[in-house]
Amino acid sequence: MSDSEEDLGVQLKGLKIARHLKESGEHTDEESNSSPEHDCGLSNQDDLTVMHTQAKEEVFKRREEDGTRTEDALHEGEAGKEGTGFPSSQSVCSPNEADSGIDRADKPILLDPFKSVHDTDPVPGTKSRSNSDSDSDSDDGGWQEMPAVSSFNIYNHRGELELTSKVRNSEQASETSPTVPPGKNCKSVNDSRFDYTKMAAEQQAQRSYRTNKKTDFLFDHKVLKKKINSSQTSVNLTSSPSTTSLNNEKNNDDDDDDSYDEYEDDVEPVNDLNRDSQLNITKNLLSDMEKFAYVGAINILANQMCTNLATLCLCIDIKSHKKLAHRLQFTQKDMAAWKTVVLSRLYDHLGISQEEIVMIEKLSLHKIQLEDLCKCLKTTQSIDNPWENDRDHEEDGIEETTERMSPNEQNGSVQASTPDPEQSATPETPKAKQSPLSSDVPGKVLDPENVKSQDKLNIDVAWTIICDLFLICLQSSTYDSRSRTLLINFAKVLNMTSLEICEFERRVTDSLDMEQSTEDQVWDEQDHMRNRRRSKRRKKMAYVALAMVGGSLVLGLSGGLLAPVIGGGIAAGLSTIGITGATSFLTGVGGTTVVAVSSTAIGANIGARGMSKRMGSVRTFEFRPLHNNRRVNLILTVSGWMVGNEDDVRLPFSTVDPVEGDLYSLYWEPEMLKSIGQTVSIVATEIFTTSLQQILGATVLTALISSIQWPMALSKLGYILDNPWNVSLDRAWSAGKILADTLIARNLGARPITLVGFSIGARVIFSCLIELCKKKALGLIENVYLFGTPAVMKKEQLVMARSVVSGRFVNGYSDKDWFLAYLFRAAAGGFSAVMGISTIENVEGIENINCTEFVDGHLNYRKSMPKLLKRIGIAVLSEEFVEIEEMMNPEEVKRKRKLINDVDAAQKKLSERKKHNSWVPKWLKPKKSKWKVMVEEAVEEGRDMQDLPENDVNNNENENPDEHEGIARQKRRDAALVDHGALMHELQLIKQAMHEDEIKNKACLPGEDKEVESSNDFLGESHYKPPSTPKINPPQSPNNFQLLSAGRTILPEDDDFDPRGKKKVEFSFPDDI
């Protein structure tokens, strides 16, 4: 065997061809008996080697001359069989077949992989195959395109079938491969159902399919034009066989132009479809009546937006706020300018005359309703094709296209030529027999070249107008937030949801290559932070100096006035520990001076340090993207706190549906967010400090602590200035200004932005909106959603914030948010109304949503964010998110345990009662009442009883009952305040004495001596035993008091029953006494 036959490519090609021909064995056997191609003679192996080498050299020479690509001879042979069926010796018996020495009837033929298409004269009517094998077989010396193999169907985020399953079984492959026509894309193979998808759930794929089905008339497959050209090429091949090679070269050149590799090619081929061409298409699809209704509805909607802004400006007294009046006036002027620009573009696009413009502008004055104008826009119509060709060419084109396309493609691309009455009656309901997601989600905008062969076009007027308006809004290469609000409001009038608009925006931008550029985005705002820090430097120095003076005055005055008392307390404490002689100095003039000066210095230090920390600048300000798909809108989220070191600010918003747009999260001041999120440290610290002061009050320095509690209450300057809550509030306000600078600089793209935040994050957004109003930056913010905002309701600020938002402004509050009700008001809010705990009234355009059913407290906002987002209308994939498991720090656990042990020890020490623990005489101290002492002793005895395990008691009972009784008497005493057993014993003694007196009286009567004697003998003193004291069980109730169940019932004795006297039986109970 020669070296050429041992080449690896030849062996692999042979194996591939053998497997391919084996799959269609029956078809090969039938033609082997009837076709004359087996009559060709076969030569020896040497001839095969010579012919093989010569053919290979000719191919390489020809490739150097004209650069044409080779094609597998197998494809040509199969095309001859699938074509007209005429036998040809040139095409049937190649030199390689003649000299192979292998019987074709027994084994599959190994054709020459280097056989050129120009070496043989093709049979008229043959079809060229465009499978991936033909591309991979061409040996051009570079990287070969390898087909992707998968065991299941995979869909992309648009719902398109990206990769079909590769069936390795020969039987299944024989069933699927012959049904695929030449040139058909792999997206239509095995696409009759929804298979595995990379999207979050199958529901998303089905939703995308239903939404995209409504706009299929505006889009077409990317390969449709190629298929139509290939069908026209086959007609030319049938008529003129001599021009086959030229047509093949032309088709190959077209394939080269269509296939673009971003890693191999330097310049991307230019696509003729753009925004302007699509605008011309949509304009031609509308009638005059629909155009006037379209323009009139947009005019009315724009006037409504201007009216709402004017109503908002009238909510406040403009005369008393001149600066605010100027800002609101500029906002109204800018809104009017935007309206003029949008309407002028629309008039020019649709060709509206000046007289018609005047008529349309007066529609709002006549109180025309939108529902009346939009009735004609909610229909599906069948219109004449404006790009129709001649009738003869149309019929030929339809016939050839029908031959070359599968039934699924015919339904997807040619169904417009035969309008369906069911589809026209219910345009929004897709048919059950339509092809699924893979074949109905194309990626190319409708091209007139693709529909020239159609007589009628079925269009949905509403979606055509939405597409036209969307492209009009993007005409200046910027997407204003007011334009998107106008688009969504208009879609609601046409009975479309915002989610469908998001799907449509994504589809249009993907088709026209209009994605938002992300290369120029800035993720770290160092420049803006530096500028803000410089502008704030002088203000910070002034505030620090003021706080220093104020702190020195507060502590200096309080320390100077109370210096004698403080000095006396210090002297008393020192004398307690054995240091004497300091009383005269500390209570004199010298001590007073020392205390006053020290208090002044300490106050100045506390004030300066606290204000410096509070006026600090923002050090961390970054953006963390969660969904970055280059969409035309952005959702920016701001978290209120972080839980632990491993927490992520994107986690509460991680369940938002990606179709809503790009989603970024603001990562700012992580140390401060972690300190807030770990615990409610502010309230807990205040309570803990109070308990420590009480603990210290029972120690040696009792007099000192008690004497300086008043100046400490007056001098909580440090806590007021630099507590974590106040510092976080001021830092959030500063971060909002930096966010405003970022949005003004368009660092996140020239697109509408939706802001979502909770707790401190909502305060960041609120500060950003006010700063945008001050900077007169309009058209940036589309929607705002605030939850649990720690901000005071000031009407001026609310009006400023609402004026820069074009869409919805939602305030989420909770009635059970005690955190804001107590802490925020105590720290900064005073008695003013807070946004996070009450509704906002008397301000136009603000929605109030009560979140109490989802939020029990302030710390539940983070956990309930997916539910709240779903409540306000944002699509979410799940109502819960999975927390990040954080590893416990051993040092932190050890520190917490030590702190708990110290607190327990201090409380135990405080609870111990000492008889002589101070210099105050005992008779001067307040005394407790007797009943208080008794209750405390009973409680302590009950605790001692509870400390004894039950198992030990049972064991002691079994071993030695006497010892157990002694232990029980010592450790288990009755917790009741009254000894019921003693009372019962005294009662029995009284009854016995009364009984003896009665017997003596009876003995004095005559005739009854014998009976009395017999009774005395029977009831002698030696035989009489009073009832013993009942054993009292230990208390079982948790409060250790058993007044209701104490004692036992007293039953009558035997001698109480006198049959002669028939005395009445009486029962006595201890509780009745």
Swiss-Prot record:
**Ranges of Low complexity composition bias in the record:** 233-249
Compositional bias ranges of the Polar residues kind: 404-427
Coiled coil where? none
Using the record's annotations, give every residue carrying the modification Phosphoserine.
435, 1037
Biased composition, class Basic and acidic residues, residue ranges: 54-81, 101-121
> DNA repair among the record's keywords?
no
The protein's matches in InterPro entries, at most eight in alphabetical order, are given as: AB_hydrolase_fold, DUF726
**Transmembrane segments annotated in the record for this chain:** 292-312, 457-477, 553-573, 577-597, 818-838
Ranges annotated as biased composition (Acidic residues): 252-267
| A Pfam family hit | DUF726
- Indicate how the chain sits in the lipid bilayer: Multi-pass membrane protein
The molecular function terms in GO held by this entry are: AP-1 adaptor complex binding; hydrolase activity
Q: Does the keyword Glycoprotein apply?
A: yes
What positions does the record give for glycosylation?
A: 190, 229, 236, 280, 411, 495, 726, 850
Q: Which PANTHER family match?
A: TRANSMEMBRANE AND COILED-COIL DOMAIN-CONTAINING PROTEIN 4, TRANSMEMBRANE AND COILED-COIL DOMAIN-CONTAINING PROTEIN 4 TMCO4
Task: Relate the protein's function as given in its record.
Answer: Probable lipase that recruits the AP-1-related (AP-1R) complex to membranes via interaction with APM2. The AP-1R complex is an adapter protein complex that mediates of cargo protein SNC1 sorting in clathrin-coated vesicles.
Describe the family membership recorded for this protein in Swiss-Prot or TrEMBL. Belongs to the TMCO4 family.
Tell me the subunit arrangement: Interacts with RPP0. Interacts with APM2.
Q: What is this protein called?
A: Probable lipase MIL1
Q: What is the lineage of its organism?
A: Eukaryota, Fungi, Dikarya, Ascomycota, Saccharomycotina
Q: Which gene encodes it?
A: MIL1
